[in-house]
């Protein structure tokens, strides 16, 4: 077993400074009142955070390593837990600060990672000149945000112009994995105009386009607390999955014959989702509108 503590800065020393920039395009004023000339001024280009500090990770583990059957099998098992405090993230600034300042990195969350890692190695001979080595690896992982800064219910990352209905696809909230996907649940496609007319009001609804679930009025377990409001808006967004895999594993096979060897490797990742941003441009309204009428 073991215990250890590590720090991670993840930010440059410049993060503490508030910066100002000048430019006629962003800050100007006709100070002489002639309406024919403009004086260049300064504007805040980045908000500083002098209170930012290193992330701190505390890891504990226990495990064993065993050789079996005269060394033919090597088994390694490890159980571990990693608590990370003062996670550094760049979060949007309040609108009262304007649209120009870049956000600083701030310490905003604590996260838990825990899991089990297993490795089994089998070595043997196929003949006098041939031998093999087979390695199986597997890792089970649980990831969860356990706390946020006071006054913060959640924070989102990702830019609005690259996701469904111009809203962030990623939300970080207590009880969910880091960078969990958050958006609208797709029920299918509108087959015809009759389905569009019968469905809740939805921006850009039309035959051949995605149909979203009206889940407003339901709790996280999808129990109905009150009737749906009959429209698709931000209150219908929900958690769609995690980018963090629940299991990762692999198989490695190496065969040696004399002075030649052949090696192959298979890897798998299970239990996680991926966000295919190219689909935003090809499948989703409003970046993709499709044909309004059939030919």
What are these regions (language model features)?
Residues 44-47, 234, 246:
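Flexible glycine/proline-enriched surface loops and loop-helix/loop-strand junctions
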Residues 13-18, 27, 123-241, 279-295:
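Conserved small-residue
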Residues 1-174:
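Extracellular/periplasmic, surface-exposed regions of secreted and cell-surface proteins
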Residues 145-146, 271-275:
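Short acidic/glycine-rich loop or secondary-structure boundary segments that cap or lie
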Residues 80-85, 94-96, 268-272, 279-285:
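Active/binding-pocket-proximal capping segment
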Residues 133, 242-270:
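Conserved C-terminal beta-signal and adjacent last beta-strands/turns
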